[in-house]
Design a protein with these regions (language model features):
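N-terminal, post-signal-peptide metal-ligating segments of extracellular/periplasmic oxidoreductases
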Residues: 2-165, 170-174, 258-310, 400-424
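Extracellular/periplasmic metallocenter environments
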Residues: 139-154, 158-162, 166-223, 349-424
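Active/binding-pocket-proximal capping segment
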Residues: 318-320, 326-351, 385-392, 411
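Short helix/loop capping segments that flank catalytic or ligand/cofactor-binding pockets
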Residues: 72-75, 145, 163-164, 205-206, ...
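Long, repeat-rich segments with strong aromatic
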Residues: 303-324
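Active-site-proximal structural scaffolding
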Residues: 8, 21-25, 190, 206, ...
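Non-cytosolic beta-sheet module surface loops
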Residues: 136-138, 187, 314-316
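Compositionally biased low-complexity segments at domain edges in trafficked proteins
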Residues: 227-252, 423-424
């Protein structure tokens, strides 16, 4: 898209899609072309920032793509007209928006991934003291090419003083269809964060444009925070969400829905519902043993050896308050909203606490540690349930049996190899 296309006269809605609302407010109602030109200069500058960097082991770079596509949720018996969606290509049945990690792919390969969404969005890892760059490419939607919305990355919980990289389109820049933009962050505080699209955010968050960000302390990547007391052997990301299949159907079929009637019927961990939460990780670029889970790549199964310390990083980017519980294990809450709860020079009080359950509201994150107990000696592993104690959410669309936000913690007698990456 040329600069002339950006400067073309736009409707008010089209202008807001470029995230220029705040620019126009600053420049005045008669300076819309100048505001758009300024937005274009920011985009061009961001492309320059994506040039090769000097090697720094603390820096991280990601290339995320915006697209839509289809995923899988256990179908309602007999169907309801909304789910399974009759337009879904086999073996999928549910429409969604999302981000895909296309880091390292060529431009041609990136374009081939349009319409191949990921739910939840990729986990981003970074290090305190380093620089994080996330390049966002807006390829648009395959199922709904009429939706030419802009999109953004909002680093939820990050105290970003630079509006251009905050991802709130009214105050910064929305990434238009066919464009790329690079977000830049200098990281100072370890912890568990989230990210999501902040453009038409109610819809885009609900439709699946959500992910987790881990910032590790520079002192030791196997600590949760800058304290050896937060050391761990294994870590697992658990991002909570909800799916309202009426909304998903209407979005795919170009129908309107009333947000005051929000009534989700599936409750997810890492984009899946139980028992699919126990299935292994997949790769969106390859077809797994269960092909319907190809674009829901993140397992929620927690595995460890007896005596190991395990870090659970969980966050909620749904719209409902949840209450997650572990049966038979004590959790030590060491962090909340990317803030260490142990004593520090600035905050000498020790605010860590031990519990077996935690209430987590939308937009909150918690870091919890537990030490795996001794193995019972019976069977290959011992099982502990990790579930939402709001029992009404432990089903899939009201169907019989367990579903929703539940997974397992499996404790082995020492037979597991070291963890190669989170959630493995």
């Amino acid at each position: 898209m040329s600069q002339n296309n950006l400067s073309r006269k736009l409707t008010r809605r089209g202008f807001l899609k470029l995230g220029g609302g705040a620019l126009a407010a600053a420049a005045g109602a008669y300076l819309v072309p100048q505001a758009l030109a300024a937005a274009n200069r920011v985009l061009q500058s961001a492309r320059g920032a994506a040039a090769p960097l000097a090697a720094n082991p603390l820096d991280a770079r990601y290339h995320l793509m915006v697209t839509d596509g289809w995923v899988y949720l256990p179908p309602k018996p007999g169907g309801t007209g909304f789910h399974p969606d009759p337009w879904a290509p086999a073996p999928f049945n549910t429409y969604t928006f999302g981000f895909r990690d296309v880091t390292g792919l060529s431009d041609a390969a990136v374009r081939q991934e349009k319409g191949k969404v990921q739910l939840n969005s990729p986990v981003v890892y970074a290090t305190e003291g380093g620089e994080l760059r996330i390049t966002l490419t807006n390829l648009g939607f395959a199922q709904r090419p009429d939706l030419t919305d802009g999109h953004t990355v909002h680093f939820h919980g990050f105290p970003n003083a630079i509006p251009a990289f905050d991802g709130v389109p009214e105050l910064s820049v929305g990434v238009p269809f066919g464009r790329s933009y690079t977000y830049y962050y200098r990281l100072h505080d370890p912890g568990t964060y989230m990210y999501h699209c902040h453009f038409e955010d109610i819809e885009h968050v609900s439709m699946g444009m959500t992910g987790s960000i881990f910032v590790r302390p520079a002192d030791n990547p196997k600590w949760a925070y800058k304290d050896a007391a937060t050391a761990f052997d294994r870590e697992f990301a658990l991002l909570l969400g909800e799916v309202w299949t009426t909304e998903r159907f209407n979005a795919a079929h170009i129908q309107e829905h009333d947000w005051s009637e929000y009534d989700p019927d599936y409750w997810t961990i890492n984009g899946r519902v139980y028992p699919d939460t126990l299935e292994p990780n997949t790769d969106p670029l390859t077809v797994p043993a269960r092909p319907e889970l190809q674009y829901q790549p993140n397992s929620s199964l927690i595995t460890c050896n007896a005596g190991e310390k395990v870090l659970l990083r969980w966050a909620n980017l749904g719209f409902q308050r949840q209450a997650m519980k572990v049966d038979g294990l004590a959790l030590t809450i060491v962090g909340k909203d990317a803030k260490y709860l142990g004593p520090t020079a600035a905050q000498p009080a020790d605010r860590r606490y031990t519990t077996d359950s935690i209430d987590i509201s939308p937009g909150e994150s918690f870091d919890a540690l537990f030490t795996a107990p001794a193995h019972s000696g019976v069977g290959a592993y011992d099982t502990y349930l990790f579930y939402n104690r709001k029992l009404a959410y432990l089903n899939n669309a009201g169907m019989p049996g367990y579903g929703g936000q539940m997974t397992e913690i499996r404790v082995y007698p020492g037979t597991l190899p070291p963890q190669p990456a989170p959630n493995f």
